């Protein structure tokens, strides 16, 4: 659920998912994490092409260019078209099983692992620290 008036282009935190998320339903943990961080959810073109999310959520050259304080890229390969839309982000955390993925090599921070385990663990730790 987005904070009123906050858009993909203006949010200080964006949690995006790519093909690695696997399905529309599998975006639920990303939605939860974005909510805990008062951010919004974005996605890659592969996700909109698969019909998992609306084009309005797409980050990239043919979507929205973003410049959040924190960009968390989950299961995104980091094709140049996506990178063009995300590269102005101040801090990028890539979560991916592929240590050689473009987004991983360009991100300031990376967790090499399964987003389906990592994202819920991050959310659980945030809830623990903030009693949410």
Predicted regions mapped to residue ranges:
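N-terminal glycine-rich FAD/FM-binding segment characteristic of electron-transfer flavoproteins
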Residues: 1-132
